[in-house]
Amino acid sequence: MRILISNDDGIYADGIGQLRKAMETIASEVYVVAPDRERSACGHGITVTRPLRAKVHPFKSGHAKGWVIDGTPADCVKLGLESLLENPPDLVVSGINLGPNLGTDVLYSGTVSAAYEAIINHVPAIAVSLAAWEELNYQVAADFMKDFIPMLKEHPMGEGMLLNINIPNNYNGRGIKVTRLGRRRYIKCFDKRVDPRGKTYFWMAGEPQNLDDDDPETDAAAVNDGYVSVTPLHLDLTDYSYKKKLAGWLPTK
């Protein structure tokens, strides 16, 4: 099996290090193409106004080959698939992200966007996140992925689909729930401050608010109950029900 790994926390992050070691135990070829620094919440941005630079990044142990890129997570996967790897991978895995990627967070997430870039290029992908901010246990997420990925050999993913996986920090084998994306927004988003010259500036902060707390089918509900959430996502954002209504009254030809 050939696996390409990326992330948005950067190549030096603990999460991607634990994921690399886990993937080396189940794949004969492992490649890591990751940003040179943290690029959290950069979405699906790509670099078009300057050249990208790729440097070989050797690891102290294991058989993985690595490159560090001065670009976004989507840049990393795009460059890896189109220019760095001699042969396409069987799977792209993005993570292990520091913190959850639940609900509409996937629209901001560089981790999930790296996985989306893979399926744009016809490679199945998984985005995996550790749903915690402190006392991080990346090993529990890495162990889960080591057991989960081999199951895909018997049950291949569909064309143009990725799996968004969120793993509780205290996961104890309670189980997996197949979920949908919940609705999530942030309140008290900006911390307003004044600099020594009297000019106003803002730090983005914010507290997450789940808008579907009464729905047990959401990813956030599953994680809050101690389950691993697995949410299938695809590229097609079309609202087909409204498409029919729109075609019914617009003067289309």
From Swiss-Prot:
Binds 1 divalent metal cation per subunit. Its cofactor is a divalent metal cation. Keywords: Cytoplasm, Hydrolase, Metal-binding, Nucleotide-binding. It catalyses: a ribonucleoside 5'-phosphate + H2O = a ribonucleoside + phosphate. One of its GO terms (cellular component) is cytoplasm. A divalent metal cation binds at D8, D9, S40, N97. It is found in: Cytoplasm. It is an enzyme of class 3 (hydrolase). Its EC number is 3.1.3.5. One of its GO terms (molecular function) is metal ion binding. It comes from the Bacteria. Nucleotidase that shows phosphatase activity on nucleoside 5'-monophosphates. Belongs to the SurE nucleotidase family. This is 5'-nucleotidase SurE.
